[in-house]
Regions:
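Bacterial N-terminal signal peptides
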Residues: 6-16
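N-terminal secretory signal peptides that target proteins for export/translocation
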Residues: 1-3
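Disordered, low-complexity segments in secreted/periplasmic proteins that are enriched in proline
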Residues: 20-24, 190-193
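Surface-exposed amphipathic alpha-helical segments
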Residues: 45, 149-193
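Conserved polar/disulfide-associated segments of primarily extracytoplasmic proteins
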Residues: 51-139, 145
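Soluble non-cytosolic domains of exported or imported proteins
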Residues: 36, 84-93, 159-170
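Solvent-exposed, polar/charged alpha-helical surfaces in well-ordered, non-transmembrane soluble domains
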Residues: 39, 43, 92, 96, ...
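N-terminal "mature-domain start" segment
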Residues: 23-55
C-alpha cells in the first residue's frame, strides 16, 4: 500500500507540473508599426526612437535587465548584390566602433562570425565576446535584407542577462516586417452640386 501511494503521488505531482508548464500564458507583447516597419516587443521593455532622415532606429531597454536591443532599418532600398557595399559603409564601422569601445573599457574582445534570422530571413552576423570586470558578456550584430531594406539588429549585455531575456530578443527578431510605407490617405474630391 505504501509503494502505490508513492507512485500515485509521483504521478499526480508530475501531472500538476506538466499542466502548469503547458498552461503558462505567453508573455504579452506590444506592437510597433510605423513607416513600413513593424515588430512586436515584450511588455516591460521601453522603446526609444532614435530615427533620422536616413534610417529608422530604435533602442529597447528594460529596468530589470542589463541588456540593450537595437533595431536599425536603412530607409533606402537595397538589393542583395548591394548588401556588401552597405556592410562596408555602415555595418563594419558600427561593429568596429563597439569593438574599440570594449577595448577602451579594458576588455579584450574576441570576434567571431555568427548567424541568425531576422523576420524569417537568414542573417549574417558578428559576435563580440568580452569580459568586463570579470563578467562575461557580448555584443551580437546581425544584418539582412528584409523587404528590400537593410535591417541591422544588435543585442548587448552580460551573458547571464542575454540568456535570461532571450525570449524578448527572439520575439523582436522574429516579428520584424518591412513593407513599403502606405501613402497618406488623401481626401477624395467632392462632386459639385
Amino acid at each position: 500500500m505504501r509503494l502505490s501511494f508513492k507512485v500515485m503521488l509521483i504521478v499526480v505531482l508530475s501531472s500538476v507540473f506538466a499542466s502548469a508548464q503547458t498552461q503558462a500564458p505567453a508573455a504579452a507583447a506590444q506592437h510597433f508599426d510605423k513607416g513600413g516597419l513593424a515588430f512586436d516587443y515584450a511588455n516591460g521593455w521601453s522603446l526609444k526612437d532614435m530615427s533620422n532622415d536616413d534610417a529608422q532606429e530604435f533602442g529597447l531597454s528594460n529596468n530589470a535587465a542589463d541588456v540593450q536591443m537595437r533595431v536599425f532599418v536603412h530607409k533606402g532600398k537595397v538589393t542583395a548584390d548591394k548588401l556588401p557595399d552597405a556592410k562596408k559603409a555602415f555595418i563594419d564601422p558600427y561593429v568596429a566602433a563597439v569593438e574599440k569601445q570594449f577595448v577602451q573599457m579594458g576588455a579584450t574582445p574576441q570576434k567571431s562570425a555568427d548567424t541568425s534570422e531576422i523576420g524569417g530571413v537568414k542573417a549574417d552576423g558578428v559576435l563580440l565576446s568580452a569580459s568586463l570586470g570579470g563578467d562575461p558578456g557580448a555584443a551580437k550584430f546581425y544584418w539582412a535584407i528584409v523587404g528590400q531594406r537593410v535591417v541591422v539588429m544588435t543585442l548587448f549585455g552580460p551573458d547571464r542577462d542575454i540568456k535570461k531575456f532571450a525570449p524578448a530578443w527572439d520575439l523582436l527578431r522574429n516579428t520584424i516586417k518591412v513593407e513599403e510605407p502606405k501613402p497618406a490617405a488623401s481626401p477624395s474630391p467632392k462632386p459639385s452640386p
